[in-house]
A protein has these predicted regions:
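Basic/polar N-terminal segments that are highly enriched at the extreme N-terminus
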Residues: 1-15, 296-302
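Conserved beta-strand hairpin/beta-sheet module of binuclear metal-dependent hydrolase folds
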Residues: 12-103, 210-226
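Active-site metal-binding loops of divalent metal-dependent hydrolases
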Residues: 31-32, 82-85, 118, 145-146, ...
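Active-site metal-binding motif and surrounding structural segment of the metallo-beta-lactamase
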Residues: 65-68, 74, 90-141
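Residue-level marker for buried hydrophobic side chains located in beta-strands
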Residues: 78-80, 114, 140, 220-222, ...
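Cap/insert and terminal regions of metallo-dependent hydrolase folds
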Residues: 94, 216-302
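Metallo-beta-lactamase
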Residues: 101-105, 109, 139-200, 249-256, ...
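Histidine-centered catalytic micro-motifs
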Residues: 113-123, 201-208, 269-276
């Protein structure tokens, strides 16, 4: 009698999904899932009570996925954000490199990393805990005001105690790229990548930045942390998160951007939207709803 086959039934399918945007190949790459306490969101009590009551899951801890995005222009392989790696999530993160390989790429092939901001759930995948560069050939780009803020020892020393880990992780993650001359900053007027426009989206961090790629009349916007919790912040765009460094500006940025996107045919890539985190926005009541892309195995023939 043969031995029973031991199967791992705890894993899901590989975490990558491709779409075509003009001549660009775009792939969402799953890094893992974070626990998100609804109390990290700020809004009127009645609004927050309604949000929590409407959830079809544990109202005390939401699951929020974290993604990175690959853009293959035909000339360059680009990542927009790189997930958390081992810097956040207590072991639930760090799947980016494996999913990148499953999608047919290696870390060595990545030419450019565009960081929407230097929080560890967006740049943690750059660096191992022992200070090794995960993407040895990549040039990393981040807004200068964000880099100056999060990498400043002086700003860190004067920051609230609860914010210290954000500074410590940003500085440790950036260090090997700074040392190698591969950490670059922009002020907003430079051409970092052909066919890509910098989109200032301040509030979450001082210079939180989106990246809009255009190709053959089609567009995709990578909008970073404009949305943390879609089930709360799409119907109620005024709801902010405790991680927003300027909550008034963050709410204003979100309201302005969501209104614009709902009226335009721009594909959106949001790292904390439900996987594959690609879709469009539609106006719904006083807020918005998310229209995700429809799964297809014919990604390059759509």
């Amino acid at each position: 009698m043969s031995s029973p086959v031991v199967r791992n039934r705890n894993e899901q399918a590989p975490g990558f999904y491709r779409v075509r945007v003009g001549d660009l190949e775009v792939a969402a790459l799953y890094d893992g899932t974070l626990g998100f306490d609804p109390h990290w969101l700020n809004g009127p009590k009645a609004t927050m009570d309604a949000v929590v009551n409407a959830l079809h899951e544990d109202p005390h801890m939401l699951d929020v996925a974290d993604k990175a995005f690959l853009v293959n222009t035909g000339k360059q392989v680009i990542l927009v954000d790189v997930g958390a790696g081992t810097w956040w999530g207590g072991g639930t993160m760090g799947r980016l490199a494996g999913n990148l390989r499953s999608a047919g790429y290696t870390p060595e092939e990545v030419d450019i990393v565009l960081a929407t901001h230097p929080h560890s759930d967006h740049i943690g995948g750059l660096t191992t805990q022992d200070g090794q560069r995960v993407f040895p050939n990549a040039e990393v780009y981040v807004a200068k005001a964000d880099s100056d803020f999060w990498l400043s020892a002086e700003v860190a020393a004067n920051a609230p105690k609860g914010a210290q880990p954000f500074f410590e992780s940003a500085q440790a993650i950036a260090a090997p790229y700074v040392k190698a001359g591969k950490w670059h900053t922009f002020t907003g007027s430079e051409i970092v990548v052909d066919g890509m426009q910098l989109v200032p989206l301040p509030g979450h961090t001082p210079a939180h930045t989106g990246y809009e790629f255009s190709s053959n009349g089609e567009k995709i916007l990578f909008f970073g942390d404009v949305i943390h919790a879609l089930r709360a912040q799409l119907p109620h765009p005024e709801v902010t998160a405790i991680f927003d460094i300027d909550q008034t500006v963050a709410a204003a940025t979100r309201n302005q951007l969501l209104s614009k996107l709902a009226n335009e045919n721009v594909l959106i890539a949001g790292p904390h939207m439900n996987f594959p985190a690609l879709g469009h926005l539609r106006k719904e009541g006083n807020g918005y709803c998310w229209a995700p892309v429809v799964f297809t195995d014919q990604w390059d023939k759509r």
